[in-house]
């Protein structure tokens, strides 16, 4: 597999800015090297076993079996205000966005939950197939990380063992998972993650374009094709998801993400 040597570029993009549609610059499988180190990789095609697992996970995620949180973007509210239409009408004219979290969830005192916990989805019997498929997908991703980034695998496994109680682990390298339906996240940095770790981002999509990961520091946008995997150090710098364009009503772009949060040592 070829190696893409990344270089830092100055820019004026700030956290919170929405990411416009940008054609992808990285469309082939490659290792990502920065400052002499492999910091991630992109695979445009996956091993059959992993493909099978994420197909099952995606099917379940799209079904009513899996509880989801509905996210309402600012443009829904803006459309309501400008056109004087109902929330339902505004949502119908925009792309519905939903997400589901598995694994560990950090304490949220402002929501009267001053303690760490495990996602309530794990108690939902109808979601069991989804949870199993996601965990198996996670373990297969870890095998690929061990294959392409053996030093990172050892480091991250050790970090999780040293900082995360067993009940808060998702696989061996992560604490949590989030599945996103049509979410084009604005520029952000995963500051809550353990430092010196990587996220694993699987993509399932149908009849859409956009929804690529844009990293302004490196002036690159990763395609995130159907059945692809992007392994990236999300704690390291800002990144955002480009605008998702649906070609028909059934179109979607789903990301199935595994990530390692800090703060689960008690």
Give the label of every model feature segment:
Residues 202, 213, 227-230, 256:
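Structural signal for hydrophobic/aromatic residues that build the beta-strand cores
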Residues 1-200, 205, 221-222, 242-266:
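Fe(II)/2-oxoglutarate oxygenase catalytic core
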Residues 222-238:
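Conserved metal-binding segment of the jelly-roll/cupin
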Residues 197, 206-210, 236:
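Coil-to-beta-strand transition motifs
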Residues 204-225:
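A short beta-strand-loop-beta hairpin characteristic of the jelly-roll/cupin
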Residues 215, 240-243:
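A generic "cationic amphipathic patch" detector
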């Amino acid at each position: 597999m070829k190696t893409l040597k990344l270089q830092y570029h100055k820019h004026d993009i700030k956290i919170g800015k929405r990411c416009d549609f940008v054609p992808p610059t990285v469309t082939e499988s490659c290792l990502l090297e920065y400052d002499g180190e492999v910091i991630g990789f992109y695979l445009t095609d996956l091993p059959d076993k992993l493909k099978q697992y994420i197909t099952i996970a995606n099917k379940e995620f799209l079904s009513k079996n899996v509880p989801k949180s509905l996210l309402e973007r600012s443009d829904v509210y803006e459309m309501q205000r400008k056109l004087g239409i109902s929330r339902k009408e505004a949502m119908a004219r925009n792309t519905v966005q939903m997400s589901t979290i598995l694994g560990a969830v950090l304490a949220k005192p402002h929501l009267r939950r001053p303690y760490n916990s495990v996602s309530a989805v794990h108690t939902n019997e109808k979601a069991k197939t989804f949870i199993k498929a996601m965990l198996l997908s996670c373990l297969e991703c870890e095998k690929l990380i061990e294959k392409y980034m053996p030093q990172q695998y050892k480091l991250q496994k050790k970090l999780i063992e040293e900082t995360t109680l067993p009940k808060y682990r998702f696989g061996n390298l992560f604490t949590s998972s989030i599945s996103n339906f049509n979410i084009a996240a604005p520029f952000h940095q995963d500051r809550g993650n353990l430092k010196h770790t990587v996220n694993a981002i699987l993509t399932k999509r149908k009849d859409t374009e956009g929804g690529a990961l844009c990293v302004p520091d490196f002036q690159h946008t990763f395609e995130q094709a159907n059945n692809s995997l992007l392994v990236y150090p999300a704690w390291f710098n800002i990144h955002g998801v480009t605008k998702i364009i649906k070609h028909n009503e059934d179109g979607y772009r789903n990301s199935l993400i595994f990530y390692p949060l800090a703060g689960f040592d008690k």
